[in-house]
């Protein structure tokens, strides 16, 4: 279980996160959503270890990982995909997946991972990770490199960024398939409705605080009730 206790973070004297506390159970598909500037991506970076909170604790299975650097945090079981996938000149897709796995794997195993993210493995396994690949292709390759680690917690920061509609629809299929064979906790930072629809749990951030959180069904019920109340109030005016 991943637990955040009273996480606060400032940048340039502006409060980005304000006393955020969360408990994320194992084997859950969690979407953190909210308006632009709500602190979503900063929270992802703090979980990853890219940013360090000004105060608060981060616990993974009861162990305090708050002060662990990004490489040690990865070793402890935190996997992540960047907002924009990184291109590595001279490195093939197979090289990246092998490095990400942290162990010796063969091309057959790499091809199996690529197939799970919707790529024709034989066409991609030996390709160089370069500008010749589209944003959607890079995104799926990065997801494959994250999936091969079998991390306890995997964080995706706005995976829909920079890809076209066709690639986005393929991405939804990849995440839907991942959810069905879920091992560990998957956290996705997104405000896309199609991604929200495949979540187990939703967390809504606003102005750096947790405004609402719960199961997808609970959250949708709250939204519908809020809308109904607004209509009643409007009708009484």
Region locations from a protein language model:
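Conserved structural motif at the start of ABC-family nucleotide-binding domains
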Residues: 2, 16-19
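The feature captures the beta-strand-to-loop junction immediately N-terminal to the Walker
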Residues: 33-35
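Helix-to-loop junction immediately C-terminal to a conserved catalytic motif
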Residues: 48
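Conserved ABC transporter NBD signature motif
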Residues: 56-63, 109
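ABC ATPase NBD coupling module
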Residues: 64-79, 223
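Q-loop/switch helix immediately C-terminal to the Walker
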Residues: 84, 90-106
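ABC ATPase C-loop
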Residues: 146-147
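Walker B catalytic motif
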Residues: 158-159
